[in-house]
Curated annotation (Swiss-Prot):
Gene Ontology MF term list: RNA binding; structural constituent of ribosome
Domain of life according to the entry: Bacteria
Cellular component aspect of the GO annotation: cytosolic small ribosomal subunit
Family (UniProt): Belongs to the universal ribosomal protein uS9 family.
PANTHER family xrefs: RIBOSOMAL PROTEIN S9 (PTHR21569), SMALL RIBOSOMAL SUBUNIT PROTEIN US9M (PTHR21569:SF1)
Claim: Ribonucleoprotein is one of the keywords in the record: yes
Protein encoded by which gene: rpsI
Annotated SUPFAM superfamilies: Ribosomal protein S5 domain 2-like
Pfam families, alphabetized: Ribosomal_S9
Name of the featured protein: Small ribosomal subunit protein uS9
GO BP: translation
Keyword terms of this UniProt record: Ribonucleoprotein, Ribosomal protein
């Protein structure tokens, strides 16, 4: 690099370089040695580890079929939302291990993990999934109980006399 001795030389050099506005971030495919995309998803107290590979639409959670693990139809619908959003219902096999939290939090964590894994497998899916809000980590957690209160915000019954 050339020696810069004055402020005018520095401004001349920096004006020639590209601005950051023109640079577009490039998302590349991230796969492991077996051709799988790996991602972690979180929701409430649940953490899900998700592996996505080409297949026939089989979803396994903690070594169980997903419809056996999540008995409620609402939870199964939450789980399948990212795959349905990109119209690839039967193109990927999904293996997930999920710990912590309740069933609702676990379903949300697996959905978040599937969405991230889909973007790692095929970066073009990112715009669709981002627009639907599947890539955003839902940071809402239960508010802690405070001392002097019955619950987080509920006070004990007040009596004037």
């Amino acid at each position: 690099m050339a020696e810069i001795n004055s402020l005018s030389e520095f401004s001349a050099v920096t004006s020639l370089t590209e601005t950051h506005e023109n640079v577009v971030p490039i998302h590349v495919q991230k796969l492991d040695s077996q051709g799988r995309a790996y991602a972690t998803g979180k929701r409430k107290g649940a953490v899900a580890r998700v592996w996505l590979k080409p297949g026939f639409g089989k979803i396994t959670i903690n070594n169980k079929e997903f419809d056996k693990y999540f008995a409620r139809p609402v939870l199964r619908m939450i789980l399948r939302q990212p795959i349905v959003a990109i119209n690839r219902d039967t193109q990927f096999d999904i293996i997930a291990t999920v710990t912590g939290g309740g069933l609702s939090g676990q379903a949300g964590a697996v959905r978040h993990g599937i969405s991230k894994a889909l973007t790692y497998y095929e970066p073009e899916f990112r715009t669709i999934l981002k627009k639907r809000g599947f890539l955003t980590r839902d940071s809402r957690v239960v508010e802690r109980k405070k001392y002097g209160k019955a619950k987080a915000r509920r006070s004990f019954q007040f009596s004037k006399r």
